[in-house]
From Swiss-Prot:
Record-listed glycerol binding positions: 84-85, 136, 246-247
Gene: glpK
Known regulation of activity: Inhibited by fructose 1,6-bisphosphate (FBP).
Catalytic activity: glycerol + ATP = sn-glycerol 3-phosphate + ADP + H(+)
Organism: Aliivibrio salmonicida (strain LFI1238)
Similarity remark: Belongs to the FGGY kinase family.
Superkingdom field: Bacteria
Protein name per its UniProtKB record: Glycerol kinase
Enzyme class: transferase
Keywords per UniProt: ATP-binding, Glycerol metabolism, Kinase, Nucleotide-binding, Transferase
SUPFAM superfamilies, alphabetized: Actin-like ATPase domain (SSF53067)
GO biological process, one term: glycerol metabolic process
Annotated residues for binding of sn-glycerol 3-phosphate: 14, 84-85, 136, 246
General function of this protein: Key enzyme in the regulation of glycerol uptake and metabolism. Catalyzes the phosphorylation of glycerol to yield sn-glycerol 3-phosphate.
Residues that bind ATP: 14-16, 268, 311, 315, 412
């Protein structure tokens, strides 16, 4: 009998590093997690220590193997998934970062973005990278490091510095500096990668004064990039065989590999991705065009929309409004009333994301009457997550011309049955909740396992993607449209607040 083999997924997130071990049936055998330091040098700036990212990630790998009693020679391959856009620049001779990692949330490069807009590059960037000009993405962060760290620009010109998103940094460290690589999904979040030619965009690199020599080689999301020796000296060499940015890994983990398949991750915010296959769809409705994974981990296209306030709006009910003791109680209180009684909550606390992109909108509660109680507000806040999701899905359908047949869901809020049912009702499509909700890690593991032949193909994996529950839509069409029109009116109120202020 052959000895059992496993796949390891390294899930490097914004607040913690995790390692997940899966067996051949795609069951999770062991998980280990370590949080790391969030650094806020000044308002709007967010950093991580790249060495701490690597230290926490490598220690979770060792811990999770020890916890499960699995030897390193039983690992068939390692897959990596990571927080996207976060930017690291290091010296390839010393292996030391020249500055902290600048995190995706960091807004310090807003001025550089304004200059790109003034230079008339907005349309070029949208057409060739699929993105909007925003400090969120890596390109302007690289420029900031080269412009502000002493000696960095000279070293970069001399070919001594390397750039990487978190996946690139981890692979470089795990292969002792032998491999400088990223995958298409992570490259597509830098704002300097051309998604038409699948090459670094030399015009944008020149505009931002970034030497091409710094940039990693870009490969598919499922192939052997290099090997790592996790047992130390004389230990086993294990192939690193899968890489994908966290949202694209979740899309793959949900088996959304064909045109028109979509998933929504309900976290602090919501991330919706729809696979558009080989067809690049340029959004006219405020969505991003990005790269995802095709059936074999090759580059395919996707539309992406982000909702800023998902689970965070429930935390607001708990922490600021004191209407809940525990976020999990929201379902119980929401079902204590038959409807939201005409109340709408628009949680635009930091403006509105896709498809509105309105930084000046503010949180609003409308439709209050004397009969409104706390349960109506709790229910309306949960409903707002579903309405915002519909806003993005409608934009995706308009851009792609593809009618959604079902929505696959993951993330913390999917445990809320009321929200999932209301989501199905609002969209008029079935909502599928998987049994294993660790879909980001699953995606990275699937990509690595397929690359080394651990799994035969997608057909074999599809049989392992068990749905825990499907929520079928119940509302009649008149009621659905009436409620959604009410939501649209409420959004207009949230957007009008700043306009009214300007008129004073």
């Amino acid at each position: 009998m052959t000895e059992q083999k496993y796949i390891v997924a390294l899930d490097q997130g914004t607040t913690s590093s995790r390692a997940v071990i899966l067996d051949h049936d795609a069951n999770i055998v062991s998980v280990s997690q370590r949080e790391f330091t969030q650094i806020y040098p000044q308002a709007g700036w967010v950093e991580h220590d790249p060495l701490e990212i690597y230290a926490t990630q490598s220690s979770t790998l060792v811990e999770t193997l020890a916890k499960a009693g699995i030897r390193s020679d039983q690992i068939a391959a390692i897959g990596i998934t990571n927080q996207r856009e976060t930017t690291i620049v290091w010296n390839k001779e010393t292996g030391k970062p020249v500055y902290n990692a600048i995190v995706w949330q960091c807004r310090r490069t807003a001025d550089t973005c304004e200059k790109l807009k003034e230079a008339g590059l907005e349309e070029y960037i949208r057409e060739n990278t699929g993105l909007v000009v925003d400090p969120y993405f890596s390109g302007t962060k690289i420029k900031w490091i080269l412009d502000n760290v002493e000696g960095a620009r000279e070293d970069a010109e001399a070919g001594k510095l390397l750039f990487g998103t978190v996946d690139t940094w981890l692979v470089w460290k795990m292969t002792q500096g032998r491999v400088h690589v990223t995958d298409y999904t992570n490259a597509s979040r830098t704002m300097v990668f051309n998604i038409n030619t699948l090459q670094w965009d030399e015009k944008l690199l020149k505009e931002l004064d970034i030497p091409l020599s710094m940039m990693p080689e870009v490969k598919s999301s499922s192939e052997v990039y290099g090997e790592t020796n996790i047992g130390g000296k004389g230990g086993t060499r294990i192939p690193i065989a899968g890489i994908a940015g966290d949202q694209q890994a979740a899309l793959y983990g949900q088996m959304c590999v064909e045109q028109g398949q979509a998933k929504n991750t309900y976290g602090t915010g919501c991330f919706l991705l729809m696979n558009t296959g080989k067809e690049k769809v340029t959004s006219r409705n405020g969505l991003l065009t990005t790269l995802a994974c095709g059936p074999r981990g090759e580059a395919s296209y996707a539309l992406e929309g982000a909702v800023f306030m998902g689970g965070a709006s429930i935390q607001w009910l708990r922490d600021e409004m004191k209407l809940l003791a525990d976020a999990k109680d929201s379902e119980y209180f929401a079902t204590k009333v038959d409807s939201s009684n005409g109340v709408y909550v628009v949680p635009a606390f930091t403006g509105l994301g896709a498809p509105y992109w309105d930084a000046y909108a503010r949180g609003t509660i409308v439709g209050l009457t004397r009969g409104c109680g706390s349960n109506h507000i709790i229910r309306a806040t949960l409903e707002s997550i579903a309405y915002q999701t519909r806003d993005v899905i409608d934009a995706m359908q308009a851009d792609s011309g593809i009618k959604l047949s079902a929505l696959r869901v993951d993330g913390g809020a999917v445990a809320n049955n009321f929200l999932m049912q209301f989501q199905a009702d609002v969209l008029d499509v079935a909502v599928h909740r998987p049994q294993v909700t660790e879909v980001t890690a699953l995606g990275a593991a699937y990509l690595a396992g397929l690359a080394v032949g651990f799994w035969g193909g997608l057909d074999e994996l599809a049989g392992k993607a068990v749905i825990d529950r499907s929520f079928e839509p119940h509302h009649d069409e008149i009621k659905r449209n009436q409620r959604y029109r009410g939501w649209k009116r409420a959004v207009k109120c949230a957007q009008s607040w700043a306009e009214l202020h300007d008129e004073e």
